[in-house]
């Protein structure tokens, strides 16, 4: 069992790295707003379309079903991201790892069936 000082010594570089990453991220987001000059005019606020006047409004309505399909894609993409390492280490994780992944897949299948019955996939 690691003592507190050993634990701190092991995780201190990770904590420092995380702190520097957060600090740099915040600086990169805040500094442009503080240092830039803001000159708004009509031409800068319009969307650019290959040097021509815009043909239509850039803020057109977008069907919500595209978002549902995108969310489904993200969910099942994450499923694959969890399944690949699980399949590689299946020999070493034992029965508990197997049944926990089966439960995870069961929950995803139940969610997929629910969306299917609610008509989220019908166009």
From Swiss-Prot:
UniProt keyword Translocase present: yes
Origin superkingdom: Bacteria
Record keywords: Translocase included? yes
- Alphabetic keyword roster: Cell inner membrane, Cell membrane, Membrane, NAD, Quinone, Translocase, Transmembrane, Transmembrane helix, Transport, Ubiquinone
Topology with regard to the membrane?
Multi-pass membrane protein
EC number(s) on file = 7.1.1.-
Assigned GO CC terms: NADH dehydrogenase complex; plasma membrane
Catalytic activity reported: a quinone + NADH + 5 H(+)(in) = a quinol + NAD(+) + 4 H(+)(out)
User: What is a single molecular function from GO for this protein?
Assistant: NADH dehydrogenase (ubiquinone) activity
Query: What stretches pass through the bilayer?
Result: 11-31, 68-88, 93-113
InterPro entries assigned to the protein according to its UniProt record, in alphabetical order: NAD(P)H_OxRDtase_bac/plastid, NADH_UbQ/plastoQ_OxRdtase_su3, NDAH_ubi_oxred_su3_sf
**Where does this one sit in the cell?**
Cell inner membrane
Judged by the first EC level, this protein's enzyme class is translocase
**Protein role:** NDH-1 shuttles electrons from NADH, via FMN and iron-sulfur (Fe-S) centers, to quinones in the respiratory chain. The immediate electron acceptor for the enzyme in this species is believed to be ubiquinone. Couples the redox reaction to proton translocation (for every two electrons transferred, four hydrogen ions are translocated across the cytoplasmic membrane), and thus conserves the redox energy in a proton gradient.
> HAMAP family per the record?
NDH1_NuoA (MF_01394)
UniProt cross-references to PANTHER family, sorted A to Z: NADH-UBIQUINONE OXIDOREDUCTASE CHAIN 3
Regarding protein family, the annotation reads: Belongs to the complex I subunit 3 family.
Subunit structure as annotated in this protein's UniProt entry: NDH-1 is composed of 14 different subunits. Subunits NuoA, H, J, K, L, M, N constitute the membrane sector of the complex.
Q: What is this protein called?
A: NADH-quinone oxidoreductase subunit A
